[in-house]
């Protein structure tokens, strides 16, 4: 796991969007939805916290055992050591019954982040035993961060991100916003709110930005919860048979399009459904049932919201009150003032 301590080197935003989505899909494919649902509760903060007077080695082993239990790995002897190293931590993926984890020497004095480093490394063990991984090293590390967060231990990695006058640090391969994004995806499935667990102010802000991005992906067209402007744009694109650049969907079947594909908002698997009629689709990977609308039919678009109609938006003009004889309301008011 990388060890970044210079705040100006911390990347932000969502540069690994494709790898994060592929990691979520791979996790659901390997574990199945039933396997993912075996992790409904995140690791409690009390189980991974260090007491001021707690022995370093005994406390580290206690936290490691708590993470092993949380990730549903077999109970075994924990061997955790500290040494000078370039990275934050490393783990031995041997087939033996013990778990061998090495931590950077700096964690001797930064005990509150030991749980974050252990969470990433112990997830490596889980993925090794599941036979789940990507050929590319960086993508495999991103997969590890995503699985750590989605199975309920990754909030520790985001909370280890700090930028203040005393220290500046980030653990893991994902950006802070991407950690918040994956945590928000998990929160939407399990009804969990990790925000009370953050002790870092910048981590809380990154969680908010990631949650906003995850919320934006929950109801893209053709899903029924899309907003009025998105529906109107989708209908226009469907009649043309071509999606606009950057649109979260793609069409096929000519113009108007007869099929549309989009990413599942839960597992990011690409789905294809008939276009132009309302239907209910079930994702074959995560089994999420999605309500799809039938926008884009060759008919007049639905009227915009009332507040937009009042401004004459979308071709709808606010009607003026008229009286018989051709007098408008404004004319009558002027006559009454005389």
Where are the language model's segments positioned?
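Short pre-active-site segment immediately N-terminal to the catalytic Zn-binding motif
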Residues: 99-118, 135-139
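Post-HExxH zinc-binding segment in Zn-dependent metallohydrolases
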Residues: 137-172
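Pan-zinc metallopeptidase signature
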Residues: 2-18, 22, 170-338
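Auxiliary, metal-adjacent structural segments of Zn-dependent hydrolase domains
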Residues: 32-96, 106-111
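Hydrophobic or amphipathic, alpha-helical segments that drive membrane association/targeting
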Residues: 1-48
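A short, surface-exposed helix-loop junction/capping segment
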Residues: 40-51, 126-127, 243-249
């Amino acid at each position: 796991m990388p060890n970044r301590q210079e705040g100006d080197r911390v990347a932000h935003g969502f540069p690994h969007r494709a790898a994060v989505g592929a990691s979520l899909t791979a996790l659901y494919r390997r574990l199945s939805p039933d396997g993912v649902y075996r992790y409904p509760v995140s690791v409690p903060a009390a189980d991974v916290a260090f007491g001021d007077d707690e022995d370093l080695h005994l406390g580290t082993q206690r936290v490691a055992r708590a993470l092993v239990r949380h990730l549903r790995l077999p109970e075994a002897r924990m061997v955790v050591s500290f040494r000078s190293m370039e990275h934050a931590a490393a783990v031995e993926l041997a087939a033996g019954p013990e778990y061998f984890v090495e931590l950077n020497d700096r964690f001797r004095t930064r005990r509150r982040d030991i749980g974050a480093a252990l969470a990433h490394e112990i997830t490596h063990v889980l993925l090794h035993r599941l036979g789940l991984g990507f050929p590319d090293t960086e993508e495999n590390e991103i997969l590890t961060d995503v699985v750590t967060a989605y199975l309920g231990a990754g909030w520790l990695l985001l909370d280890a991100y700090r930028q203040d006058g005393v220290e500046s640090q980030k653990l893991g391969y994902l950006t802070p916003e991407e950690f918040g994004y994956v945590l928000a995806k998990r929160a939407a499935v399990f009804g969990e709110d990790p925000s009370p667990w953050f002790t870092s102010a910048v981590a809380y802000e990154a969680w908010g930005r990631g949650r906003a991005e995850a919320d934006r992906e929950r109801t893209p067209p053709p899903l029924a919860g899309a907003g009025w402007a998105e529906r109107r744009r989708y209908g226009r694109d469907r009649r043309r048979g071509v999606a606009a650049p950057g649109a979260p969907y793609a069409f096929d079947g000519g113009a108007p399009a007869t099929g549309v594909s989009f990413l599942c908002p839960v597992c990011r698997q690409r789905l294809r459904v008939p276009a132009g009629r309302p239907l209910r689709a079930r994702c074959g990977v995560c089994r999420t049932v999605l309500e799809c609308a039938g926008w884009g039919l060759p008919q007049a678009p639905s009227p915009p919201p009332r507040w937009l109609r009042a401004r004459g938006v979308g071709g709808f003009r606010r009607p003026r009150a008229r009286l018989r004889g051709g007098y408008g309301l404004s004319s009558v008011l002027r006559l009454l003032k005389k």
